[in-house]
């Protein structure tokens, strides 16, 4: 009657982040830049034993069970990235920012594990370029635009197919799990891996404006964006006659468009 589980999980994460920054002025131009690298190593291990059919009720010990079903799980992933960032500002009213990053992910096959994604953004402050526009009523008029990408790898071990503990059922009675009658059994997982997976990318284009009025007592922040994700990594159903029921593929696209508007005000100030 009843059951018990004895489980253990260990997680080890190692992260390092290094940057080198510099800045310099050239007349009316101010230039800042940075380069760096990032390293992430993630390891987890879990083990458990499920016991079924307790001999003595309420005696919570795994040895009190008639049958045992052991299981383990492990995950090791690594990611190494390098990046660079350069920003140029002219007379505090015109700016341009260029970024680039390249990651190498262990969750993708060696031929496809490089993930490069750049980004460019710029802004123009109208009230700084034309100081006559700036007064007690109009404090800030700023326009901005950006386009950039973000990439990521696949789920851990998604590039290969693996064997898992076997089980059987007729749909009416209880499920028979191995080991059974002192015999171990394994079967190919119902999910097929895919060593042709490529990185998943999300590109976003945005245009916006920042406005401030009446000595900054009324501010408006508006952003119009268009976000598209390609090569979405999904578990896709496949015919069971192939020996599996799903396969990991670059099979999806997502598109999002929207307007973000934030209005803040201080109607009464003492």
Predicted stretch roles:
Residues 1-270:
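Extracellular/periplasmic, surface-exposed regions of secreted and cell-surface proteins
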């Amino acid at each position: 009657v009843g059951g018990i589980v004895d489980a253990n999980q260990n997680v080890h994460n190692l992260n390092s982040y290094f940057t080198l920054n510099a800045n310099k002025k050239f007349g009316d131009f101010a230039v800042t830049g940075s380069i760096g690298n990032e390293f992430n190593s993630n390891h987890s291990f879990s083990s458990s034993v499920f016991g079924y059919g307790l001999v003595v009720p309420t005696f919570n010990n795994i040895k009190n069970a008639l049958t045992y079903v052991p299981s383990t799980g492990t995950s090791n992933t690594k990611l190494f990235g390098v990046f660079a960032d350069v920003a140029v500002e002219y007379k505090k009213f015109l700016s341009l920012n260029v970024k680039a990053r390249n990651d190498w992910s262990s969750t993708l096959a060696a031929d496809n594990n490089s993930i490069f994604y750049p980004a460019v953004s710029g802004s123009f402050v109208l009230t700084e370029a034309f100081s006559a526009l700036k007064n007690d009523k109009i404090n800030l008029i700023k326009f901005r635009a950006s386009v950039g990408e973000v990439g990521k790898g696949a789920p851990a071990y998604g590039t290969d197919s693996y064997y898992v503990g076997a089980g059987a059922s007729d749909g009416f009675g209880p499920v028979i799990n191995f080991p059974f009658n002192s015999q171990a059994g394994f079967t190919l997982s119902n999910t097929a891996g895919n060593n042709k997976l490529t990185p998943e990318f999300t590109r976003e284009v945005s245009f916006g404006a920042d406005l401030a009025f009446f000595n900054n007592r009324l501010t408006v922040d508006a952003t119009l964006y268009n976000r598209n994700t390609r090569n979405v990594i999904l578990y896709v159903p496949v015919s069971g006659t192939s020996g599996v029921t799903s396969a990991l593929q670059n099979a999806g696209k997502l598109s999002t468009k929207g307007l973000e508007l934030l209005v803040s005000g201080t109607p009464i100030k003492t």
